[in-house]
Curated annotation (Swiss-Prot):
The protein, known as: 3,4-dihydroxy-2-butanone 4-phosphate synthase
Quaternary data: Homodimer.
BP GO annotations: riboflavin biosynthetic process
MF-aspect GO terms: 3,4-dihydroxy-2-butanone-4-phosphate synthase activity; magnesium ion binding; manganese ion binding
Binding, Mg(2+) 2: 38, 153
Chain positions of site Essential for catalytic activity: 136, 174
Cofactor names: Mg(2+); Mn(2+)
Pathway participation: Cofactor biosynthesis; riboflavin biosynthesis; 2-hydroxy-3-oxobutyl phosphate from D-ribulose 5-phosphate: step 1/1
Cross-referenced NCBIfam families: ribB
Family the UniProt entry places it in: Belongs to the DHBP synthase family.
Gene3D superfamilies: DHBP synthase (3.90.870.10)
Its EC number(s): 4.1.99.12
Amino acid sequence: MNQSLLAPYGNPIERVNAALSALRQGKGVLVVDDEDRENEGDLIYSAETLTNQQMALLIRECSGIVCLCLTDERIKQLQLPPMVSDNNSQYGTAFTVSIEAKQGVTTGVSAADRVTTIKAAIADDAKPDDLARPGHVYPLRARPGGVLERRGHTEGTVDLMKLAGLQPFGVLCEVTLPDGTMARLPEIVEFAQQHDMPVLTIEDIVAYRNTQ
C-alpha cells in the first residue's frame, strides 16, 4: 500500500476515527484493501442512513453491483441461502441470492427502488416474506469475526458500522473509472477529494480493532 498517498488522512487510528465520524453524519467513506489482494476501493455507506442520492452516486460512479453487507444473524433472519452451494470464487465472497422488496418498488432497478429494498432487509421486524428473490440488491454475509477473521470489504463494512454505533449493516460498491476499469489508490484518493470523503484501508480497521 502506498502510504504516502494516505498520509494526508493521518495514521491508521486517525483514519478510522475520521471514517466513523463521517458514517455517524450519514456520509460515505472509501475503503481500500491490499495491493496483493483485490487492490480495489469500495464506496461504503451505512444502510441505516442511506439516501436515494447516495444510491444514485453508487450506481453512477461505481460498478453498479450494489451489495448489502449483513451479519450472519440477519442472513438467517431473512432466510437467505448462499448464491451457490460451492463457493469457489477467488476470495470467497459470500454472496447470497439477490433480493428485491415486495412492496414499494416497480422494476427494482432505480436508485429509489434499491434503497427501498435495503431498508426492507434491515428493518428490525424484517421477515423472509418481505423480500422477493432474485432482485437487484446483492447481500453479502460478513464473517462473525470481522476483519480479524477475513480481511475483506464485507467484514470491514460491518466492523465500521459496529464501531460507529450504527446498525451493523452497510452498502458497498467498487469504484470504477469512466472507461469501466477499476479505480486504484491514486484514483480513489482523487475521488475522495472530489466528494469530501475520508479514505482508509482494511489494515487500518485491523489495527484499530487490535487496540480495542
